[in-house]
């Protein structure tokens, strides 16, 4: 009998992507995050779909519809907690996935990397518009402050802000359109993720050594399917622990109060996964400068392949670059902490130093370290 998975037009694609795919034999647990992100996306789309069945995107009823979901809908509290904390798990996996790419030089697959950066931006946009939907205090003021940054654009700024708002303030029109964006974007992300995979399978996976693994490859199934299954179990365990035992751990208490345009919260801050970028934004006293720094903090990822100076692809055998990479990691954690603090000393100066170090590390120190390591490895006789 002819093997259907190798001949059927649809099954053939699945077979070449997830079953008979030749995979390097030495990829570590850091290569699990792609499948974990796929799982996160599926969880978010499913929980989001069921939440959307009960949610109303109207300023008068949005807040109470979320309360209704939690109180009156069967397992509505679980859906909401999984969706809110699923976003946190999503970003956790995203940051680790990007970090893995930087550490092991995966960014040298330029098409895959660039689509990945676009995916990161799309997920950030989805999370941002989704945060307005519960119509709590922090939802309202967070959306007001961040959308208002568009007004820093010379000449067209103010017009642009009012165009995004659909009026002169964040109101019903804004909520309705943000709900529409929040619904459509995950499907765009799914399409982009497919393209991301398509480009990856053109070249094959990178591996911890950063060398050509063609001489030693194994089929994806059963080796990596079982490995991915273990990762998924651990992800689900962590998500359930978070959603069932401390669902409000990562949220803001201000969001338990309905949105009130007449009362500003003492500290306006976004969700934890945006705090590093928010800290960079706040560290520059000029509005336009801050907005440009905010954009640069993410878009800098696009030029990382151009800044690769080392002869070795991976950082596995490059101690100087490794040290700088872990300093960058610590720096991002510091920025995340600063983003959640009030604008006063010593937080201002710490934020400014950390922001400066962030760009200095990526643009200057890491490329220099790569060049120095090349020099050190050159035969001296």
From Swiss-Prot:
Pfam families: Cytochrom_B_C, Cytochrome_B. Heme b b562 binds at residues 83, 182. The chain crosses the membrane at residues 33-53, 77-98, 113-133, 178-198, 226-246, 288-308, 320-340, 347-367. SUPFAM superfamilies: a domain/subunit of cytochrome bc1 complex (Ubiquinol-cytochrome c reductase), Transmembrane di-heme cytochromes. One of its GO terms (molecular function) is ubiquinol-cytochrome-c reductase activity. Heme b b566 binds at residues 97, 196. Binds 2 heme b groups non-covalently. Keywords: Electron transport, Heme, Iron, Membrane, Metal-binding, Mitochondrion, Mitochondrion inner membrane, Respiratory chain, Transmembrane, Transmembrane helix, Transport, Ubiquinone. GO terms for biological process: mitochondrial electron transport, ubiquinol to cytochrome c. Its main location: mitochondrion. One of its GO terms (cellular component) is respiratory chain complex III. InterPro entries: Cyt_b/b6_C, Cyt_b/b6_C_sf, Cyt_b/b6_N, Cytb/b6-like_sf, Cytochrome_b, Cytochrome_b_C_euk/bac, Cytochrome_b_N_euk/bac, Di-haem_cyt_TM. It is found in: Mitochondrion inner membrane. Its cofactor is heme b. A ubiquinone binds at residue 201. Component of the ubiquinol-cytochrome c reductase complex (complex III or cytochrome b-c1 complex) that is part of the mitochondrial respiratory chain. The b-c1 complex mediates electron transfer from ubiquinol to cytochrome c. Contributes to the generation of a proton gradient across the mitochondrial membrane that is then used for ATP synthesis. The cytochrome bc1 complex contains 11 subunits: 3 respiratory subunits (MT-CYB, CYC1 and UQCRFS1), 2 core proteins (UQCRC1 and UQCRC2) and 6 low-molecular weight proteins (UQCRH/QCR6, UQCRB/QCR7, UQCRQ/QCR8, UQCR10/QCR9, UQCR11/QCR10 and a cleavage product of UQCRFS1). This cytochrome bc1 complex then forms a dimer. Heme 1 (or BL or b562) is low-potential and absorbs at about 562 nm, and heme 2 (or BH or b566) is high-potential and absorbs at about 566 nm. Belongs to the cytochrome b family. This is Cytochrome b. The lineage of its organism: Eukaryota, Metazoa, Chordata, Craniata, Vertebrata.
């Amino acid at each position: 009998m002819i093997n259907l998975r190798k001949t059927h037009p649809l099954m053939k694609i699945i077979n070449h992507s997830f079953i008979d795919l030749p995979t390097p034999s030495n990829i570590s647990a850091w290569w699990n995050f792609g499948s974990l992100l796929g799982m996160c996306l599926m969880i978010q789309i499913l929980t989001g779909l069921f939440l959307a069945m009960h949610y109303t995107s109207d300023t008068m009823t949005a807040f109470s519809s979320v309360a209704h979901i939690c109180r009156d809908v069967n397992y509505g509290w679980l859906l909401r907690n999984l969706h809110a904390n699923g976003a946190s798990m999503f970003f956790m996996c995203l940051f680790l996935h990007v970090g893995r790419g930087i550490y092991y030089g995966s960014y040298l697959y330029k098409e895959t990397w660039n689509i990945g950066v676009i995916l990161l931006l799309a997920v950030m946009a989805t999370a941002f518009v989704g945060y307005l939907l519960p119509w709590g205090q922090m939802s309202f003021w967070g959306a007001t402050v961040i959308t208002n940054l568009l007004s820093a654009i010379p000449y067209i700024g103010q017009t642009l802000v009012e165009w995004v708002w659909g009026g002169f303030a964040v109101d019903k029109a804004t909520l309705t359109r943000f709900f529409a964006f929040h619904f459509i974007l995950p499907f765009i992300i799914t399409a982009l993720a497919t393209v991301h995979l398509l480009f990856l399978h053109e070249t094959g996976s990178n591996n911890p050594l950063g060398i050509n693994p063609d001489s030693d490859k194994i089929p994806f199934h059963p080796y990596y399917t079982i490995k991915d299954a273990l990762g998924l179990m651990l992800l689900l365990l962590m998500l359930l622990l978070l959603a069932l035992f401390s669902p409000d751990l990562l949220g803001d208490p201000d969001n338990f109060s309905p949105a009130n345009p007449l009362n500003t919260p003492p500290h306006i801050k976004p969700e934890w996964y945006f705090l590093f970028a928010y800290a960079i934004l706040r560290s520059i006293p000029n509005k336009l400068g801050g907005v440009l720094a905010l954009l640069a903090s993410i878009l800098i990822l696009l030029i990382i392949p151009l800044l690769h100076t080392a002869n070795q692809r991976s950082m596995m055998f490059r101690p100087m670059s490794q040290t700088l990479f872990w300093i960058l990691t610590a720096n991002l954690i510091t920025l995340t902490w600063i983003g959640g603090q009030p604008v006063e000393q010593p937080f201002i100066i710490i934020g400014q130093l950390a922001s400066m170090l962030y760009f200095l590390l990526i643009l200057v120190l890491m490329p220099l370290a790569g060049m120095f390591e090349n020099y050190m490895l050159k035969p001296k006789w």
